Design a protein with these regions (language model features):
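N-terminal lobe of the biotin/lipoate ligase/transferase fold
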Residues: 1-141
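Conserved small/polar residues in nucleotide/adenosyl-binding loops
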Residues: 144-146
Length: 146
């Protein structure tokens, strides 16, 4: 008596390598991400980089000069090749960069952003911090009085 063949199982997504990089200036981190992406092969594992930056504003593709900081506070503003407008990065702010092969994982940019936002909202809720996302502006907002 032979057993029926097992049904094919969906392949699990490959693991993601997590790198905790500490305080890294924005420009070298950005350059390294571009190098990583350019050198990526079909079997290159995806990575998650966790780091902080010294104070810097980044202006994405939609960043208009009228949205830039209005005072010269000594913090540089850098034009970068990402979506969005102006973002501040600084010490004490955890930045997570996902270096994913999105085709291999079968996900688009907008669904990925929504899933990441929800993951952050859920994590903060676990610590009793109320947070929310907005459909008109990517990101997670939490107003905390320290």
């Amino acid at each position: 008596m032979s057993l029926p063949a097992a049904a094919p199982q969906p392949s699990a997504a490959p693991p993601i390598i997590v790198r905790r990089l500490g305080l890294v200036p924005y420009v070298p981190a950005w350059a390294r991400m571009r190098e990583f992406t350019a050198a990526r092969g079909a079997d290159t594992p995806d990575e998650l980089w966790l780091l902080e930056h010294p104070p810097v504003y980044t202006a994405g593709i939609a960043g208009k000069p009228e949205h830039w900081p209005r005072v010269d506070n000594g913090i540089p503003v850098l034009r970068v090749d990402r979506g969005g407008q102006i973002t501040y990065h600084g010490p004490g702010q955890l930045v997570a960069y996902l270096l994913l092969d999105m085709r291999r994982r079968g996900i688009g940019v907008r669904p990925l952003v929504r899933q990441m936002e929800q993951a952050v909202i859920n994590l903060l809720a676990d610590y009793g911090v109320a947070a929310e996302g907005h459909t008109d502006a990517p990101g997670v907002l939490s107003l905390i009085h320290i």
